[in-house]
Amino acid sequence: MSVSPSSPAPTENPPAATEDLAWRKHIPALAAAVAGIREASDAWDAVSDSFCDTDGWPVDEQGYEDAKVKRDAEAWRHVEVFLDHGPEVLAGVRATARSADYAEGPLSEDLRWLRGIDATLEHAGQLQREWDQILALMDASMPGSRQLYEGRTKEERNADGWHYADELAIRGPALVRAAEHLVRRADAEQSAHTTRARAALARSASGLRGTMPASPPAPSAPGAPVPGRSR
């Protein structure tokens, strides 16, 4: 299977010690973010039709817009979690996965789904940086204007970010599954290594006990007759 140009080429990595997988601590946050984006999307799907006629045109435009604003805001909150935790987990997965994982096995499909997630995270991060710059310009050039315009600019950012939230709802689960699989495998390999090491140590200790030299005979008691000598 070919690898995306944006993805580093897989290498044959030795079994990773579990203590080296520092990125594992970020996995629960990503799993929660995936669930959060899905919940925001499902909540929108549940009410969006109620604001529209049978042809799909809004009949309650204000209600439709308010519900969409709420969806975008909730989804973006979880996109920010991906921006904080996703790059480190993605790098860890790619550093830990082996060449064989890309070709076949339980990881292969999830690794394929990770193609393009770099671009999604980069574009979402750029959107966040642009919004931060806008706020900084407001504070610098129009003191006091932030309170007037921040809410509206935030809504615009969230609306633009919905596309990236939707992408992460598709590719994010693959990242979480791949990360969890690699961590479990590393734990299992580390446990097996520890078991083998203990068994080898036990065999070594047993062998040393079996070859210990015999103790020298105890000296004869004083006055005892010497064997082989006549009186």
Can you name each region flagged by the protein language model?
Residues 111-205:
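Amphipathic alpha-helical coiled-coil/helical-stalk segments
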Residues 194-231:
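Long low-complexity, Ser/Thr/Pro- and charged-rich intrinsically disordered regions
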Residues 46-153:
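Long, low-complexity or tandemly repetitive, helically biased scaffold regions used
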Residues 1-81:
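Leu/Val/Ala/Ile-rich N-terminal alpha-helices, chiefly Sec-type signal peptides and the beginnings
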